[in-house]
Amino acid sequence: MARSGFEVQKVTVEALFLREIRTRFGKFRLGYLWAILEPSAHLLILLGIFGYIMHRTMPDISFPVFLLNGLIPFFIFSSISNRSVGAIEANQGLFNYRPVKPIDTIIARALLETLIYVAVYILLMLIVWMAGEYFEITNFLQLVLTWSLLIILSCGIGLIFMVVGKTFPEMQKVLPILLKPLYFISCIMFPLHSIPKQYWSYLLWNPLVHVVELSREAVMPGYISEGVSLNYLAMFTLVTLFIGLALYRTREEAMLTS
């Protein structure tokens, strides 16, 4: 009995996922360690720089928990979108096999990055909890929905830049450049309410602001972020994914044969 298209894709993605693990980490344990060290280093540096100031301005909020719920979502977005851009070149030889499609490589990479950073998030949240910092997951559903939309958004952005970058290779260099200022305007190091309201209309166009603030709301009792919206995040994500899939559909054959 012939397998359905979904079953074929599932098997393909599983094989690509295992290949990504071997490629990403190989035989070296340091690869797994680096996944923990990178966000930990960011956390420690920002705690050292802003810890005292933020403790004075937000005395009832755990600053390590506040930071973690900004850093990890940004790392998920950055890692999935960046690694999606180079997915074709890294797996070019596999496209000789008929079942393997470029979009499968993005799904496999997104799954791996998600598992890595969810594990890192849980581990670091446990560490700060054992260190005496308080948090409580008051809205687990909101947290899951927010992060799910974040992952889909990251895939959509990666898909757009992968397709466009295949036609115009210089575009592959644009995404890393765009991510640098995003780090500073996504409310990672500061709460939205610390910004004068006249500037909110500009910041709130950025979907990562909604991701970060909604994540904090879900795990920090009493933290309410005015202005952010799960509906806006969902709409932005779906539009981005639609554009990515539309571009991919028109260029899939060209990407496979180039």
From Swiss-Prot:
Q: Which residues form the ABC transmembrane type-2 domain?
A: 30-251
Taxonomy, superkingdom: Bacteria
Alphabetically ordered keywords of this record: Cell inner membrane, Cell membrane, Membrane, Transmembrane, Transmembrane helix, Transport
Instruction: Please tell me whether the keyword rRNA-binding is annotated for this protein.
Output: no
The UniProt entry, under PROSITE patterns, shows: ABC_TM2
Q: Which Pfam families match?
A: ABC2_membrane
Q: Does this entry carry the keyword Transmembrane helix?
A: yes
**InterPro entries reported in the protein's UniProt record:** ABC2_TM, ABC2_TM_bact-type, ABC_2_transport
Known function: KpsM and KpsT constitute a system for the transport of polysialic acid across the cytoplasmic membrane.
Name used for this protein in its record: Polysialic acid transport protein KpsM
Classify the protein's membrane topology as the record does: Multi-pass membrane protein
Q: Which GO terms describe its cellular component?
A: ATP-binding cassette (ABC) transporter complex
What is the organism field in this record?
Answer: Escherichia coli
Sorted alphabetically, the Gene Ontology BP terms of this entry are: lipopolysaccharide transport
Disulfide-bonded cysteines: none
Single annotated GO MF: ABC-type transporter activity
Q: Which family does it belong to?
A: Belongs to the ABC-2 integral membrane protein family.
Task: Provide the protein's localization.
Answer: Cell inner membrane
